[in-house]
Amino acid sequence: MIPLHENLAGKTAVITGGSGVLCSAMARELARHGMKVAILNRTAEKGQAVVKEITAAGGTACAVAADVLDRMSLERAKEDILGQFGAVDLLINGAGGNHPDAITDVETYEEAGEGQSFFDMDERGFLTVFSTNFTGAFLASQVFGKELLKADSPAIINLSSMSAYSPMTKVPAYSAAKASINNFTMWMAVHFAETGLRVNAIAPGFFLTKQNHDLLINQDGTFTSRSHKIIAGTPMKRFGKPEDLLGTLLWLADESYSGFVTGITVPVDGGFMAYSGV
């Protein structure tokens, strides 16, 4: 168990997409360190299970409905959070995911191939995936940013991906959005550097989540060929576990540990990026 970061106690964290596999683990850990945690999802009900876990363990949390692509929805969520917790100290932009309309069925183009090709992808599906993963972080940062600037040691942590560095096959919209997240993280870090607001990102390696389950796990529960490629390309020879992200999360969230760190994206990937394949 990670030692408690006393500097985080009493502060408020807002987590978009907070009920997801990775972000819910972050929410529980931040609450363990004494932070008040607001879990944002399209419906408040999606976050209630995480809130119950946190409160049962003695922490403080609330579930709030918010659509990260709707500014007014985010504004209402902000007012709700301020009414309950009084401030915002940390924003984690974790909302994201994929959609079948923005995924090709084959890794490389085949003229006579079956299934959805690049030319078959639906524009609306592509834009929805890109917007959810990138524009949602932009809007949430705008809405909560003014409150963050009032805090003593504010921080934004964006969720990136291995696909930001070298785009994964099949998921062009997701890959483009995550590359944009890395760039936007650096832009915001410079823009707000003199205010004390630090902006960084975490790029998880390959973790099993609800969003990628069908790409990585067959119906019979075995690994897909894509999973086998991932494991072969990961020197630690396994998928990541949510708890693998928590040390990096706490380091970036706690100014006493990372007060001079801004504008970086930290890979937590079991060596995936370092491995050349030979």
UniProtKB/Swiss-Prot annotation:
It comes from the Bacteria. Disulfide bonds: none annotated. Induction: Induced by galacturonate, repressed by glucose. Keywords: Oxidoreductase. GO terms for molecular function: oxidoreductase activity, acting on the CH-OH group of donors, NAD or NADP as acceptor. Pfam families: adh_short. PROSITE patterns: ADH_SHORT (PS00061). InterPro entries: NAD(P)-bd_dom_sf, Sc_DH/Rdtase_CS, SDR_fam. Its EC number is 1.-.-.-. Belongs to the short-chain dehydrogenases/reductases (SDR) family. Member of the exu locus which is required for galacturonate utilization. This is Uncharacterized oxidoreductase UxuB. The gene is uxuB.
